[in-house]
Amino acid sequence: LDVAAPDAGEQAVGTAVEAFGAIDLVVNNAAIEADARVGEGRRDAFERVLRTNLVAPWALSAAAVGPMRRQTRAGRRPGAIVNVGSAVGLFGRAGRAAEASSKAGLIGLTRTLALELADARIACNAIVPFAGTRAIRAIGDADGALAAFRDRTATLAASHVAHLVAFLAAPQAAGISGQLFGVRGREVFAWTQARPAASCFQPRAFDADEFAQALRGLRRDFADLADDVEAFGDDPVS
């Protein structure tokens, strides 16, 4: 199934309902990459990544929410949606604009679905996985921090991620929605929602000099310009 095809979402949902009679879990996991720096890559390659990594999860979720709502009203336990993101979507990485853009959008979609489905008690959460997948092994030739990141992550079993996905669909996870989790071997962590870290104000509009002065006062709260490789350069709990 080409998840980026226009009718793929409806086709997948129809097949699942026909085979199992209901939909208890939707996992948006399919993803592709197109490594290129901005200004060097092709637009069609960038758009292909967005269609697979972001539009396809939207389409599959859109096709599934109707049946999931109806079966919940009929008395079935509410289902769940789990979106699989990436640390690149949170931190960025040079040469990975397409993945970063699509996976950052997936986090916004996760929050929005959680809000829209709260009345039906259908949960939607996202997971940022660190595991020895084909994508990690495909990094290939690398040196320095990227090589160390690849080698550390390659030791982590993907089953750790699968166990959390299964839990988020279980009755014990009732009430957990709109959250972003990370799985790195035997370590599970929750990301905070982005919120203002500091602020400043004045009675009138800021001019350029006043902006400069105000932002100097906020500088201690600026986010570090570190990519995911730098942020997770320590040894995982494998």
Q: Over which residues does each language-model region extend?
A:
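Active-site helix of classical SDR
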Residues: 61, 102, 110
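Residue(s) in the substrate-gating loop at a strand-loop-helix junction
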Residues: 86
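C-terminal helical subdomain
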Residues: 126, 147-238
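The beta1-alpha1 cofactor-binding region of Rossmann-like NAD(H)/NADP(H)-dependent oxidoreductases
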Residues: 1-11, 43
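A glycine-rich helix->loop->beta "capping" turn
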Residues: 15-26, 34, 75, 123
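Substrate-binding pocket helix/loop in short-chain dehydrogenase/reductase
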Residues: 37-47
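Active-site-adjacent segment of SDR/Rossmann-fold oxidoreductases
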Residues: 91, 107, 112-122, 171-174
